[in-house]
Each structure stands twice: as structure tokens, then as C-alpha cells.
Amino acid sequence: MRVTAILTLATIAIASPTKVLNSRNELARRQATEGCSIGYCTQNGGTTGGAAGDTVTVTDLASLTEAAESETPLTIIVSGNIEGSAKIRVASDKTIYGETGSSITGVGFYIRQVSNVIMRNLKIGQVLADNGDAIGIDESTNVWVDHCDLSGDLSAGKDDLDGLLDITHAAEWVTVSNTYLHDHWKASLVGHSDSNADEDTGHLHITYANNYWYNINSRAPSIRFGTVHIINNYWDSLLGTGVNCRMDAQVLIQSSAFSNCPDEAIFFADSDYTGYAVVDDVDLGGSTNSVPEGTLTASSLPYDAIEALGSAQIAATIPETAGQKL
């Protein structure tokens, strides 16, 4: 489908640069109104974001904040480069979509106690801890993070920045797909505390599909209590540790690969109880898996099967497709 679109644009370009721009804008608007079709965010009625509402384009922090926090369904297209120091509270029924080449620097997005949110094709970086995570999902349902580029700053102190993508407080029906997480101390936390079992147990159903983790120190991801499916992920040049399975989490890791990583690829640490993992066609790249085998299997997942690329294809494929590539 994308190949056809690219060929069509190439043909038009010969005749009219203006038509090319218009065609690209139209393609972006179509993609911005697509609903989630992969993983856990297809459950519970699905995830459509702001598709039922109007579409607006924003070019500055004030307009982005106003649109994201509004109470009506809305598709928000981010154009250009937005910089600032802020924590935006995203309301329900929102799609926030980045145009190709757009970026957001220093601004965190807080998705708390809402539902039906899509964050797509966004490049977000250098969010200081005072502004939360680059994307924080807290006590929310039906959230899709797709084709995002999330980064930090390894030259900063470990606690100067928080997570790139944290999912906490019994959040449900979340998919993270085609996303590039890189150059950061703490990438992605599922379940924030060992003491939160009463709230988190039975929740935190999350899919990580087709993601690229590069130059990350830890939490790639770190999982407490949740039910998490990881498929077609690539970890390259991790600085510390990989997938931490903790506090009775049930994890299924399929069709994935590690490269140039330290010893602990799939492991348990820093909690009272271990988590569990079923590991199927994963190239550990010389690293290790020390987690007890779990019970989560592909046949037990409630959504349509995600095509497994095969561990041998991951290193060549995922870096080319993950990130702000729409």
C-alpha cells in the first residue's frame, strides 16, 4: 500500500511539486485518522483516537496544548518544530500525529485517567523530569503509540530525565508499535512499584510490536504485574540491561533479536518476586535469558495474530521501519 503511494508521488513529482505536496498532506491526513489495528489496543471496543472529530494543525506549544487538552474528539497534526518546557495533559478521544520532519523538544505528554488516545509519527526528545515522561500512560485505556521517535540525553544525569514511555497504574489495552526508543537512561516502565499489586494485578495488557531499542541503559522494558506481548523487537547496543520481568508479570517474547548487548537480555532484578517469560525464536546475540518459563502463549492472545518476521530478519528490517517513518 505504501509502495503504491510512493510510486504515485514519484510520478506526480515530475509534473508538479505543488501536487506532490498536496498529495503528501492528504496521505498524512488519512494516516492521522486511522485506528489501531494491531495488538491489545484493538480490544475493549478498539482505539480510534480523534477520528470522530475535526482535524486541526498546530505549529506552536500554546496551540498544541489547547488542542490536546480540549474535551472534544480531535485529530491534531503537529507541523514544524515545537520547543518548550511543559507537561501536556492529553484528553480522551485524541489523535496527535506528527508531520514528516516535525519534532517536539522538552515537552512531555501525560495520558492520565482517559481513554481512546493515539500518539503517532511523533518525534519527542529531551523531556526533563519536571515535565514527566516523553509519553506517560497512567490509569488509561485504549492507547496506541505508533511510529514515534522517543529519545533522551545520556550526557544528562540519570534522574534529570524520567522515562521515554511509562505505562502505569493499571493502564489497559495499550499497543506500542514501530517505535524507536534511543539514547536514554530509562526507556519504558510497565508498573511503577512493587507495592501496587492491588491496583495493577489483572491489568497492564500491553503489546510491543516492531520496535527498535538503541543505546538504552535499562527498562527495555521493565515489567511488573502485567501481561505483555513482545514481537519483532530489536535491541542494539544496550548499555546495561534488557527486558526485566518482575513481580509475577507474564511475558511472551517472539521473533526478536539482541545485538551488541551486555549479558542480561531477559532477566529478573530489583523486586521481591520474579516474573515469567515464554521466549520463542529470539536471538540473544550471546546474551542470556535467566527468567523462569511462563504461561502466556500466542494461542492465548485475544487479538489477531501479528506476523512474525523471524529473528534472522529483525536486525535488517526493524531499524528501517521504526520511528517517524510515515
Swiss-Prot record:
GO molecular function terms noted in the UniProt entry: metal ion binding; pectate lyase activity
SMART domains the UniProt entry points to: Amb_all
Principal EC category: lyase
Any one of the GO CC terms: extracellular region
Reaction catalyzed: Eliminative cleavage of (1->4)-alpha-D-galacturonan to give oligosaccharides with 4-deoxy-alpha-D-galact-4-enuronosyl groups at their non-reducing ends
Keyword Ligase: no
Co-factor remark: Binds 1 Ca(2+) ion per subunit.
Binding residues for Ca(2+): 133, 162, 166
Keyword Calcium: yes
Cofactor or coenzyme needed: Ca(2+)
UniProt KW keywords: Calcium, Carbohydrate metabolism, Cell wall biogenesis/degradation, Lyase, Metal-binding, Polysaccharide degradation, Secreted, Signal
Entry EC no(s): 4.2.2.2
GO biological process, one term: cell wall organization
Subcellular localization, as worded in the UniProt entry: Secreted
InterPro entries, per database record: Pec_lyase, Pectin_lyas_fold, Pectin_lyase_fold/virulence, PEL
Active site positions, chain numbering: 219
UniProt main location, coarse: secreted
Function per UniProt: Pectinolytic enzyme consist of four classes of enzymes: pectin lyase, polygalacturonase, pectin methylesterase and rhamnogalacturonase. Among pectinolytic enzymes, pectin lyase is the most important in depolymerization of pectin, since it cleaves internal glycosidic bonds of highly methylated pectins. Favors pectate, the anion, over pectin, the methyl ester.
Family membership noted in the UniProt record: Belongs to the polysaccharide lyase 1 family.
Protein name: Probable pectate lyase B
Taxonomic source organism: Aspergillus oryzae (strain ATCC 42149 / RIB 40)
Lineage: Eukaryota, Fungi, Dikarya, Ascomycota, Pezizomycotina
